[in-house]
Regions:
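Glycine-rich phosphate-binding loop at the start of an alpha helix
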Residues: 31, 48-51, 73, 123-127, ...
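A structured beta-alpha segment of the ubiquitous adenosine-cofactor-binding alpha/beta core
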Residues: 26-27, 95-115
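Active-site-adjacent beta-strand anchor residues
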Residues: 40, 65-69, 97-98, 119, ...
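ALDH superfamily catalytic-core signature
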Residues: 85, 110, 116, 123-178
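Beta-loop-alpha module in the N-terminal Rossmann-like domain of NAD(P)-dependent dehydrogenases
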Residues: 34-37, 44, 100-107, 121-128, ...
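PLP-dependent aminotransferase-like
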Residues: 49-105
Length: 178
């Protein structure tokens, strides 16, 4: 999906002109890779979330250092091995660093060689990632906390939401929409 999107997306496409504060503005969409992306993923949905971090970074032309959760390192390790053995992605573009040391995520966020950080997980940890990354003024992309519970109002049509509610796993706390 991401490779196809990168090939067919209209980068460098002019957008419609707008007026802002009384002045005409010319806009253009430009593809500019962030650079080195540090990606920190949680334990739930590990394969999907690792791919959800890798795909956009690679499609944008970035290199990536992926740090999976300490509880689920093998999903990322297998993906890294498949990339190394089955793709033409050059060595060093995708880097997997698995560790049980939670300080590794903080090291990624703080490292001045990392240009952007993406994190999926708890709000408390996301705040810490943002705090540490701000010291080197890098881009930070956060998807935080389980906040997508099903809310069904009294006047809702039961037939309209029946099948959808069955797919709501983890009580809305699964970070699968990253």
């Amino acid at each position: 999906y991401w490779a196809d999107l990168a090939e067919r997306y209209a980068f460098e496409a002019p957008m419609s002109d707008i007026t802002f504060m009384g002045q005409p503005q010319r806009r253009i969409l430009r593809r500019e890779p962030v650079g080195v992306v540090g990606a920190i993923t949680p334990w739930n949905f590990p394969l999907y979330l690792n791919l959800a971090k890798l795909g956009p970074a690679l499609a944008a032309g970035c290199t990536i250092v992926l740090k999976p959760a300490p509880d689920t390192p093998w999903s990322a390790t297998v993906v890294g091995r498949l990339i190394a053995e089955k793709t033409e992605i050059p060595a060093g573009v995708v880097n997997i660093v698995a560790s049980s040391d939670h300080a590794l995520g903080e090291m990624l966020a703080a490292d001045p060689r990392v240009d952007g950080v993406t994190f999926t997980g708890s709000t408390a940890t996301g705040r810490r990632v943002m705090e540490v990354a701000s010291r080197t003024v890098k881009k930070v992309f956060l998807e935080l906390g389980g906040k997508s519970a099903n809310v069904i109002l009294d006047d809702a049509d039961a037939g309209a939401f029946g099948a959808g509610i069955l797919t709501c796993t983890h009580g809305g706390q699964g970070c699968a929409i990253t």
